[in-house]
Amino acid sequence: MHQRLATLAAARLYLCTDARRERGDLAEFADAALAGGVDVIQLRDKGSPGEQRFGPLEARDELAACEILADAARRHGALFAVNDRADIARAAGADVLHLGQGDLPLDVARAFVGPDVLLGLSSHDRDQMTAAAAGPADYFCVGPCWPTPTKPGRAAPGLALVRAAAELRTGKPWFAIGGIDAQRLPEVLDAGARRVVVVRAITAADDPAAAARRLSSALAAAR
């Protein structure tokens, strides 16, 4: 747990990726992204091109994809995260379980995954953010900063919520999330964030390692 917390504290770039079933290159992609500077890598297949083409990811296939990402994360000294599924997180030996507001309560998730798995929580307004900062989650995310196809129909609180998070001056790690890419990153940094979650900025890149490196370098320069 202590090593995971230390790795989390130093983390700046958090990537959510789908299982890339339509491409069949998950292992190669993960290695490239992690080599480029991704600190945390999470599997999130909801709404992905693979889901649209092949249907929802079955639990057995999700576990197999998790094992690929977990192995890559270990080799690169990064953290591997599972989205929503406490059972998959436990089975895959995940470092992190990330939960949304409508997922398992944190105390229930903690009882299921044990004391060594880090817990993260999404927040989408000031009340949720303040509660997340004060609560038992090991880190929290704030956003979306911009509307994103990853969360269709969800209103984006925008950079105002990022500014509010920065004003909390909490010692707990937090990440800005939602529609962030290399072009928008300066705005996010100006709002006070020093950690970000990205999706398409790396998953849609022709060169994932280069895309990750560009983001990681900008985050490092802003410390």
Swiss-Prot record:
NCBIfam families: thiE (TIGR00693). 2-[(2R,5Z)-2-carboxy-4-methylthiazol-5(2H)-ylidene]ethyl phosphate binds at T148, P149, T150, G179. InterPro entries: Aldolase_TIM, ThiamineP_synth_sf, ThiamineP_synth_TenI, TMP_synthase. One of its GO terms (biological process) is thiamine biosynthetic process. Belongs to the thiamine-phosphate synthase family. This is Thiamine-phosphate synthase. Its EC number is 2.5.1.3.
